[in-house]
């Protein structure tokens, strides 16, 4: 007979209690929060019935002001009003000042070169600013859902690297939130769209937000969302449209540069309003700083056309990575407020040969997808068969002898993932090994991005090649990497979580992929040369060590001279640039030293058998 557990009222959790979870779209321009209520996912609104929260924080007073109230202060208090903070996450101060020279903020560098914003309220870093936005969204969710959140899913651009993802998680922690998962924005859109439509096949998600662009090629099949390939630009978005239009207006007005922070913000606000108006009308009358004139949609489209073309280049690369032709794409899902721009819809439609889907609110679809995923991860849908397969955007590898890159996890590998590979020592008696973690598609370390270094110490002294070091790369569901190196005979190990000090610039991401294709032939030639040089070094060092140990006993003077000549010839070839010549030199040296190697083997066997009888062998 089964025993029933009985608890005092209120002392145990109800087995079917619905946990409060929310999805947060932490956007560059606007942020949203969504949740599943009564089986339906929807965005949660503020007291005024607004879903969108401008991602703007004002620090002019003792308390942070977030959202629409902060936006209203952006012109009068530009240095204390932080806008588009997402662009600053995970970047160095040098990178920010180079890329965004006209930002009105007062910056200083932290000890490790990261940006600190100096405000009337005090110093703030991008993580703290992001946390203040998250706090407002969390409060909205808790008021709407009637209690404390058990966890949240926060969306990030697919191209966010480790530093930017870690910064997002740190901001959530600072806001007092438990992160169930970080979710790629295009994948979140696919969740919302896939569940609504029940479609199966290949779908392209074109996500153009305020500050980032992402393209994802996904395969939807029986509840499985598989990301075939991703691409994009971590610093291209609707904000750039605004800046181009603001610069155009400044020229029309005849303003001298550099502009004051106040004038710059005024121009940007007018540019944003004008851009939005072009979605409904062909021309807009603009009045600014005493200048009055008409700006046409055609003028605006000519300004932004090169940027839209740039997004289509990323689309082309993503299709190639996914091994999919444009005509195989069943639907194109438009995500992000910037996809309301008519030229964007027109050019994307021409590229894919079909009219993009715009029936889902492009501002809300990411948050809704995150809300659905949060509901599942919170345990509210235990019978859910939805499986999410994200991928890593750039290969992760390790440096080996000769400056070569050995790829451990190739790009577009589904995450979470763990891969291991064994390595060995290069020199006799080596007791430590340096592990250099790199990111990129090229064959040589100098052409890839360095992520981190750490050392494994305590390797037992052995002959070169005898030690076995197992290196494991593990990428979690949030795209964060941890690396472990372990010497197998002793179990000694060292571990690091990769959290670089700043993120990739927008051009670096695209260039890393482009260069891997442009220089593919040269890279393979460079790799072949480096591999032969490493092998030559091994042969040279091994032969010199053997001659020092047994040369006087086992070799005549003439034989010594022959081997030394072979070594000198190989050194000369090794310092050249012909891989085939080095390979032949290695073969010649091996052939010249074969008799010496046989004598050393005989000597070792005699020494091992000395003093033993037939019976004991």
Curated annotation (Swiss-Prot):
Gene3D superfamilies: 1.20.1270.10, 3.30.420.40, Actin, Chain A, domain 4, Substrate Binding Domain Of DNAk, Chain A, domain 1. The keyword Ligase does not apply. The keyword Nucleotide-binding applies. One of its GO terms (molecular function) is ATP-dependent protein folding chaperone. One of its GO terms (biological process) is iron-sulfur cluster assembly. Residues 1-23 are annotated as: Disordered. Keywords: ATP-binding, Chaperone, Nucleotide-binding. It holds the Pfam family HSP70. HAMAP family: HscA. Belongs to the heat shock protein 70 family. Chaperone involved in the maturation of iron-sulfur cluster-containing proteins. Has a low intrinsic ATPase activity which is markedly stimulated by HscB. This is Chaperone protein HscA homolog. It comes from Vibrio vulnificus (strain YJ016).
């Amino acid at each position: 007979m089964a025993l029933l557990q009985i608890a005092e009222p209120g002392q145990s959790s109800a087995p079917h209690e619905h946990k409060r979870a929310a999805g947060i779209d932490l956007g560059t321009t606007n942020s949203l929060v969504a949740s599943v209520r009564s089986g339906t996912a929807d965005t949660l609104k503020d007291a005024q019935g607004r879903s969108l929260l401008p991602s703007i924080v004002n620090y002019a007073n003792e308390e942070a002001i977030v959202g629409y109230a902060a936006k209203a202060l952006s012109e009068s208090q530009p240095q204390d009003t932080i806008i588009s903070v997402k662009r600053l996450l995970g970047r160095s101060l040098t990178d920010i000042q180079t890329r965004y020279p006209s930002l009105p903020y007062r910056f200083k560098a932290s000890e490790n070169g990261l940006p600190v914003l100096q405000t009337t309220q005090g110093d703030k870093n991008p993580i703290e600013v992001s946390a203040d936005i998250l706090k407002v969204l969390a409060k909205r969710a808790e008021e709407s859902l009637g209690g404390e959140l058990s966890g949240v899913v926060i969306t990030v651009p697919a191209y966010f690297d480790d530093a930017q993802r870690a910064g997002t998680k740190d901001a959530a922690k600072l806001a007092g939130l438990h992160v169930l998962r970080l979710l790629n924005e295009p994948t979140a859109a696919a969740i919302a769209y896939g569940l609504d439509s029940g479609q199966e096949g290949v779908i392209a998600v074109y996500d153009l937000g305020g500050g980032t662009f992402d393209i994802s090629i996904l395969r939807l099949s029986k509840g499985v969302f598989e990301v075939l390939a991703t691409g994009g630009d971590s610093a291209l978005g609707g904000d750039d449209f605004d800046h181009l239009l603001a610069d155009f207006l400044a020229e029309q007005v005849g303003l001298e540069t550099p502009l004051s922070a106040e004038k710059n913000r005024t121009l940007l606000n007018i540019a944003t309003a004008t851009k939005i108006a072009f979605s409904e009308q062909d021309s807009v009358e603009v009045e600014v700083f005493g200048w009055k004139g008409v700006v046409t949609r055609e003028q605006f489209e000519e300004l932004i056309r090169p940027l839209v073309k740039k997004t289509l280049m990323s689309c082309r690369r993503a299709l190639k990575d996914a091994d999919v032709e444009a005509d195989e794409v069943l639907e194109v899902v438009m995500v992000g407020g910037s996809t309301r721009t008519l030229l964007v819809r027109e050019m994307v439609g021409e590229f894919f040969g079909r009219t993009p889907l715009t029936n889902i609110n492009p501002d809300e679809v990411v948050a809704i997808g995150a809300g659905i995923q949060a509901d599942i991860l919170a345990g509210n849908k235990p019978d859910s068969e939805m499986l999410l397969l994200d991928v890593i955007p750039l290969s992760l590898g390790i440096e080996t002898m000769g400056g070569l890159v050995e790829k451990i996890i190739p790009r577009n590998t589904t995450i979470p993932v763990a891969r291991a590979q064994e390595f060995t020592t290069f020199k006799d008696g080596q007791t430590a090994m340096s592990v250099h973690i790199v990111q990129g598609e090229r064959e040589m370390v100098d052409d890839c991005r360095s992520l981190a270094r750490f050392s494994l110490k305590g390797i037992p002294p052995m002959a070169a090649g005898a030690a076995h070091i197992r290196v494991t790369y593990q990428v979690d569901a949030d795209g964060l990497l941890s690396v472990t190196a372990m010497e197998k005979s002793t179990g000694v190990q060292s571990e690091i979580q990769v959290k670089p000090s700043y993120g990739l610039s927008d051009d670096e991401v695209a260039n890393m992929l482009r260069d891997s294709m442009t220089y593919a032939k040269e890279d393979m030639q460079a790799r072949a040369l480096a591999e032969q040089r490493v092998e030559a070094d091994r042969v040279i060092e091994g032969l010199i060590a053997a001659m020092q140990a047994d040369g006087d006993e086992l070799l005549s003077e003439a034989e010594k001279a022959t081997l030394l000549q072979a070594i000198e010839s190989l050194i000369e070839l090794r310092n050249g640039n012909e891989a085939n010549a080095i390979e032949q030199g290695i073969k010649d040296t091996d052939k010249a030293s074969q008799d010496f190697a046989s004598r050393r083997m005989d000597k070792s066997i005699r020494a091992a058998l000395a003093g033993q009888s037939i019976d004991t062998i």
